[in-house]
């Protein structure tokens, strides 16, 4: 029932503030700039931040970014080392790095034992722990917002980790009593979640409890805690699982690469990044009972008028039970030698409504149900297209994931309960940009093609300045 006590590693904990954080997002202009595989900067179609690795010192308020990540995972997953590596890497780039201590470890090291508490006392302690976590994080978040430098805030576990150590009924009661909701606690509070898989799952020879005073789990319990902590974050739009399929050094590099990729920082081959987005066509979905635990979201995409053929912009509205998050994505190819950059900005509802005036009439609005789930240490997003929309989207279901695996290793981690028709990675026929076009593909000049995938080889090459939608991330 404890909250994230299994790994006393230092990284920043993120969590949501009771109602106040949500109100702040509604009332203030959003100042968090994020560049993720699709994340960062201003929603203005023409503005693009510099992403040079050697940017040092202060930055202009317009370009400044405050990026909040959660390091989570099972016991002996590498969070302490990972936090240190992230800190060193980003400080070398000139960023200010804040490290929020793990609240559970701080409180439990003061003599608290759950075995000594009554059920009522344990519930109240857990609730106060989360409130404390929220306040500690808010202190660091405000420091990040007031700094004149780009800031990375590393949270050693976040609020949703607490749900792994408490019953569903008690968790929902606690959320309702504090005016919390999953969209604010899980999706809007943090920019990215990094789950470092426990050594007990895939690297058993290296599993140890010797270096942590609050850790005593055996291998089987460590595996269980690892799964629970990952399941707690299913549904976050930018959730990366860093498994033990490589040696530890490469695992750390993959973690750093994941953050850099989502921030839009060009690292070249410094970390030998191999992870890539994969997309699959799926037919005839099975009953919900065949899925592992999942989170469903309503998602709405609007393409916007852009400043030119090299720029593409869109809005995304994503939510559950009438709680929403809003993201603006601006995409430009060939920035500072990078193949593609997607700049994402978290928006307030007011900013979102204002930007809707820039909708591109050449595109349908895209409506989806998005199902997020975790299986075989792999995070998947299943997009089920809904009406209204173009007839070409009727019944369309696409599965997406990010992986560095290939061959049989990749095949073995895919969900066996889904009827996967074929891989469509890079196929422009399944690009959201093309799927949303109102004009017929055979006559429109807006259809974007690629000469790198299957049947596209028979088509004319892409003009040099044209946006490549098959590289896009569907948010």
UniProtKB/Swiss-Prot annotation:
<dbReference type="InterPro" id="IPR027417">
    <property type="entry name" value="P-loop_NTPase"/>
</dbReference>
<feature type="compositionally biased region" description="Polar residues">
    <location>
        <begin position="1"/>
        <end position="19"/>
    </location>
</feature>
<dbReference type="InterPro" id="IPR033469">
    <property type="entry name" value="CYTH-like_dom_sf"/>
</dbReference>
<feature type="region of interest" description="Disordered">
    <location>
        <begin position="452"/>
        <end position="475"/>
    </location>
</feature>
<keyword id="KW-0653">Protein transport</keyword>
<keyword id="KW-0342">GTP-binding</keyword>
<feature type="region of interest" description="Disordered">
    <location>
        <begin position="1"/>
        <end position="59"/>
    </location>
</feature>
<dbReference type="InterPro" id="IPR038727">
    <property type="entry name" value="NadR/Ttd14_AAA_dom"/>
</dbReference>
<comment type="function">
    <text>GTP-binding protein which is required for the light-dependent internalization of the TRPL ion channel from the rhabdomere on the apical surface of photoreceptor cells to the cell body and for the recycling of TRPL back to the rhabdomere in the dark. Binds to 3-phosphoinositide (PtdIns(3)P) and phosphatic acid and so may interact with membranes, particularly the early endosome membrane where PtdIns(3)P is predominantly localized. Plays a role in preventing photoreceptor degeneration.</text>
</comment>
<keyword id="KW-0446">Lipid-binding</keyword>
<dbReference type="GO" id="GO:0005829">
    <property type="term" value="C:cytosol"/>
</dbReference>
<dbReference type="GO" id="GO:0070300">
    <property type="term" value="F:phosphatidic acid binding"/>
</dbReference>
<keyword id="KW-0963">Cytoplasm</keyword>
<dbReference type="GO" id="GO:0045494">
    <property type="term" value="P:photoreceptor cell maintenance"/>
</dbReference>
<protein>
    <recommendedName>
        <fullName>TRPL translocation defect protein 14</fullName>
    </recommendedName>
</protein>
<dbReference type="GO" id="GO:0005525">
    <property type="term" value="F:GTP binding"/>
</dbReference>
<dbReference type="GO" id="GO:0035091">
    <property type="term" value="F:phosphatidylinositol binding"/>
</dbReference>
<dbReference type="GO" id="GO:0015031">
    <property type="term" value="P:protein transport"/>
</dbReference>
<keyword id="KW-0813">Transport</keyword>
<dbReference type="InterPro" id="IPR053227">
    <property type="entry name" value="TRPL-trafficking_regulator"/>
</dbReference>
<dbReference type="Pfam" id="PF13521">
    <property type="entry name" value="AAA_28"/>
</dbReference>
<keyword id="KW-0547">Nucleotide-binding</keyword>
